[in-house]
Amino acid sequence: MHDFVSHILRQYFHATNWNEYNSYLHLTSCSSAILDFCVPTGLSLSISASPTPPFFTTYRLGALPNLRAGIGYIYASTDSKIDFGGSSKDVRLKEIIERFRIVEARAPAAFKSKEKEKEYYWLAGDRYPEQEALGDLGKKERGGGEYLVYGCMHVPSARLDALWTKRISPTWQLIVTAVSSPPRYPLNALQNAAIASRSAYSTGAKSTSSSMDRLDSSNPSLSSSTSLSNTGASTAATTAAAAAAAAAAQDTYGLGPPGSTNLQFTLQRDTGRWFTEYSYSIDDALWGFRVLHNFGTPADTASTTLAALSEGAVETSSSASYPQRNGSVLHTGSSSSSEDTEAGGGLRGRFSAGAEVFISTVEKSAGLSTGIRFSTLPDTPQQPLMIAPSFDSSPSPHQASTLASAPSQPPTVITATLNPMMGHLSTAYAARMARDVVVCSRFDFNVYSYESEWTMGAEYWLRKSGGGGGVESVEASDADVPAPMNRIGSTSSIGGLRGHDETRQARFQEEHAMSLREASEAVSQVDGNTGDGGTSVFGLLRDPPALAPSAPSPRATCANSTLSHLLSPITGVLKARISSTSDIRLLWQGRLSHCLVSLGVKADLSGTHGASYSVGGAPASPKMGIVKSIGLEVMYFSQAEDESVE
């Protein structure tokens, strides 16, 4: 689970339209989310808040195994508001939990007429005017000027972490990070060690000078010929004595290593098909370069259609206010048949290849790695469907089967990385086998030592049994489901708005661009189905006359159960991994009350219980058991209430 700082940083990238997953650094993020998840150690508590929209505070406390704490502050300046979920109670779990996902790289959209080709150009997936018109725009319209500042102080180590990122242009971004660690000893120990070192240095210098005087007085004929060599010898002896005295003082007074400060600059450029990254670290003079190239245009299949749907969202929302009913399904997309886009066997996707190079001028060392990735493309929605509000008591089996229909191909990501200097080769395969089940396997091999490791893991999303309506059900639905299916679930479960405050009602209507007429019809539909005879939530339409209850048909019951399971809210995720080295990890992440909880355990099957015995028969130190660590992490965050909302 992402901590609050990482969550805010990712939402900042989303608010500024920056795709961080297009970097070579995230080439294997899909498999790492399933196989390399972190298990919390000990007990930790995190409390965060947002007093004002651009300002965030976070406090972290760890009780076990050692007492530690940290306090941090975040300030962001963006054109659009950062939507971090509001609170830990309302945030979508799939936004804050590190999970398997397929993120499309931004690409130039192909839906533009020939008459407007001279007026606009496409850059990083966004449309901009020509250079003549671009010069008249301000800095905000150009995409620059947005920044984020973060600082955190850790206790008791007094380590300071800082981050500053600034959006230079629509395709350029600068990130500066700093880590400062103070010396690990108190001031009184430092003063005592300095006095001891000074006295040892003076004593060594006096003894060296006295020995040289005795040598000169005993043999004056050699004094003139060996003056230069004696001077060098005395200097070396003095330096060695001072170093030995300093080392002895450090051991005597318990002095630790001196403090250090590392400052790193990272410059990133994203054009959709190309992502380049330049970095420099001051501490060890480490230069780095990363590059990732996406073969083919991401807009070949799904992205173009999704871009067209996003451009026509205004027309869709306006037409949705006065729908033309065709049974209970509205066709808002194009009327092209699905037979035109059907392909043969195999997976349809796109390849991405990249590499990274690091060179340290101080340590005279270098590093190199390269990798390739294949990811499937999402389905192209040919006919987006939206259930129109009606007074039917239950959805038809056709609608339920449409909701529960699986994609034409399972979302799959295949990666392969190679480190030629270390001889390390790694291949990974991750796929979504069901709506809530993702499996992944990875094989690591070293060509020099012939050592290998096989790792397998899975994640399973838990849902509330019986289903739950309301906004939480809609917000907790699968984010990977195409937009039409999300629109279906949102409209069919709008009746669950009853009992929520007006703020959620307004937010729900704004997100789905629905008119009050549709909302009132949907609420009246629920009231008519329940037969409670109460008034509507919005109070815009009269309640329909109560109908005599009738026994539901088996087909309607099956459809209702399918729809209820589809709209059931997510309560958590269960992750597990096992490797050939007997390393086992189990992690549960979910929401309890208003808090986000992570509970994990790490075990090693090669460990044995009991004490081991030495050669003489005396018992030695006992070995660690199978369970290596158990951890619990609780996170809570909220924001100040908006007083402008009545």
Swiss-Prot record:
Polar residues composition-biased segments: 315-333
Subcellular location: Mitochondrion outer membrane
GO terms classed as biological process: establishment of mitochondrion localization; mitochondrial genome maintenance; mitochondrial outer membrane translocase complex assembly; mitochondrion-endoplasmic reticulum membrane tethering; phospholipid transport; protein insertion into mitochondrial outer membrane
Chief place where the protein resides: mitochondrion
Any Pfam family the entry gives: MDM10
InterPro entries in UniProt: Mdm10
Disulfide bonds: none
UniProtKB keywords: Membrane, Mitochondrion, Mitochondrion outer membrane, Transmembrane, Transmembrane beta strand
Domain notes: Lacks alpha-helical transmembrane segments, suggesting that it resides in the membrane via beta-sheet conformations similar to those predicted for other outer membrane proteins and porin.
Entry-linked PANTHER family: MITOCHONDRIAL DISTRIBUTION AND MORPHOLOGY PROTEIN 10 (PTHR28035:SF1)
Subunit text: Component of the ER-mitochondria encounter structure (ERMES) or MDM complex, composed of MMM1, MDM10, MDM12 and MDM34. Associates with the mitochondrial outer membrane sorting assembly machinery SAM(core) complex.
Stated role: Component of the ERMES/MDM complex, which serves as a molecular tether to connect the endoplasmic reticulum and mitochondria. Components of this complex are involved in the control of mitochondrial shape and protein biogenesis and may function in phospholipid exchange. MDM10 is involved in the late assembly steps of the general translocase of the mitochondrial outer membrane (TOM complex). Functions in the TOM40-specific route of the assembly of outer membrane beta-barrel proteins, including the association of TOM40 with the receptor TOM22 and small TOM proteins.
Family membership: Belongs to the MDM10 family.
Name of the featured protein: Mitochondrial distribution and morphology protein 10
The species this protein was found in: Mycosarcoma maydis (Corn smut fungus)
Native organism taxonomy: Eukaryota, Fungi, Dikarya, Basidiomycota, Ustilaginomycotina
Gene: MDM10
